Amino acid sequence: MKRKIVIAVDGTAGSGKTATFNTVAKKIGYEFIDTGLMYRAFTLLCIESEIDFNNKEEIIESLKKFDFSVKNNKPHLNGKEVEKRIQENDIVKFINYVTPIPEVRKFMVEAQRAMVKGGGYIEIGRDITTVVLPNADLKIFLDSSVEARAERRFKQNERLGIKNNNLNEIKNSIINRDEQDFKNGLRKAEDAWLIDNSNIPIQDVVNMVIDKIKELEGN
């Protein structure tokens, strides 16, 4: 009987982590966890509980009522599916009140570790390969050149009909985001598999990763 493994994924913004590894998870029957959604779900809990976001103690106390899970690759808050709700503007408005709190960060890291016990999970997010899951069975750092990421974003904006779509502005935005992320600790773990998908179609990356997972599972 094959064993299910734990896969940790980090990488640069806009490199396609979600699209790539959500696809991998669906193809091999694993659960996909975007840890950033945990913070969004917790922000939603605080909103629904009418927490004063200027009161850190109230926010920390709310962690006792927070139960996050993933079922069929969809985020659930206290048993309720919240995939669309946590993308709404009020979440974006208030999330920065909760993410800097050390007690919230500590709670989330412990939860992120506990969720993947037993294997069968792909987890992506901040510090996943270096801090959260340093002993994951497979660690991957997904990267892509600034030019490739900007071109993809530009084409995506075109498809969505977004106005003021400027390639150079997108490039500068990506460069600034990279600088900020690396300043805040983004780095490739020494034993992580570096995949540069600048010139590789997403489906080819998906197939490469699935082959590696099957190898580690003992297939």
From Swiss-Prot:
Provide the catalytic activity annotation. CMP + ATP = CDP + ADP; dCMP + ATP = dCDP + ADP
Q: Which family does it belong to?
A: Belongs to the cytidylate kinase family. Type 1 subfamily.
The name this protein carries in UniProt is Cytidylate kinase
* Subcellular localization, as worded in the UniProt entry: Cytoplasm
Keywords, ordered alphabetically:
ATP-binding, Cytoplasm, Kinase, Nucleotide-binding, Transferase
Alphabetized GO MF terms: ATP binding; CMP kinase activity; dCMP kinase activity
Q: Which GO terms describe its cellular component?
A: cytoplasm
- Coiled-coil segments on the chain, per record: none
Q: Which residues bind ATP?
A: G11, T12, A13, G14, S15, G16, K17, T18, A19
Q: Which GO terms describe its biological process?
A: pyrimidine nucleotide metabolic process
EC number(s): the record gives 2.7.4.25
Q: Does the keyword ATP-binding apply?
A: yes
Note the Pfam families from the entry. Answer: Cytidylate_kin (PF02224)
Q: Which CDD domains match?
A: CMPK
What organism, scientifically named, is this protein from? Mesoplasma florum (strain ATCC 33453 / NBRC 100688 / NCTC 11704 / L1) (Acholeplasma florum)
